[in-house]
Amino acid sequence: MKRLAKRLQDFNELVMFQHSVFSLPFIFIAMIVASNGWFGFKLLILGVLAAISARNAAMGFNRYVDRVYDKENPRTAGRPSVDGRLDGGSIAIFTVVNALVFMAVAYFINDLAFYLSLPVLMVLLSYSYFKRFSSMAHIVLGISLGLAPMAGAIAVLGNVPLWSLLLSIGVVFWVAGFDLLYSLQDMEFDKTNGLHSIPSRFGSDITLKISALFHVLTVGFWGGFVFAAELGLFAIAAVIFAALMLSYEHYLVRRDFTQIDRAFFTVNGYLGFVFIGLIILDKVSL
């Protein structure tokens, strides 16, 4: 039993399950808006399973193909995929199983979700290779998580309304923006090892400016989402709160690069959960 618990702990550390807080709220924001309130326990369970299995597949694949780089990077050398706790075969099986679970769950959601499940997986897995040849990997990561709100709308409605597209584009720039900040930690390592990123190509000052621009766009697209979905004051408050949190994130990082982890996880985690809380209040108050 202890061995199983340790194994599960290692896989949890491998995929950093706690980082699911970035995508889960926005899937359910879309589902709440699409259903005009409550979308049912069936879709709740299927939505959670789809989000977690898709993310596990993407993270498992990333850890598998990046082992050679992670081993050399002091920041990542302690990962289970590198230090011997999990071998390549175990990680590969974990990735394949989660990919199959994702497709199976999509089948039980609706036809469109199932038909799109394989293309979505291809997008999620492609991120792992982009740093090898393009500085646009940050955008690809943003797109990977930005698919979540559209997926939520598809689960409920079977189509992609304009408001879900605006919400998704906002998530793309939100994620790409904070990934730029997070990547500042690996700027020198990427330069030395021939990996492509905006920080390694343009330096920290330009990276900070691009990240800030992305987050301005985030707020703009989320404002468009509120307008297109005809939401109320609580939803407007959610966008204002997001703007304040993103400003605070940039304040932390500009003041001290050692605050990047705090800015990355804590600030963005609060942003997602408060955002969905205010959207729920908006629907309840109508």
Q: Where are each of the predicted segments found?
A:
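Cytosolic, membrane-interface loops and tails of multi-pass inner-membrane proteins
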Residues: 1-9, 59-86, 180-205, 251-258
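Multi-pass membrane catalytic core of lipid/isoprenoid biosynthesis enzymes
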Residues: 44-45, 49-51, 67-118, 192-233, ...
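Membrane-interface helix starts
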Residues: 16-24
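Intramembrane alpha-helical segments
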Residues: 4-13, 49, 79-167, 245-255, ...
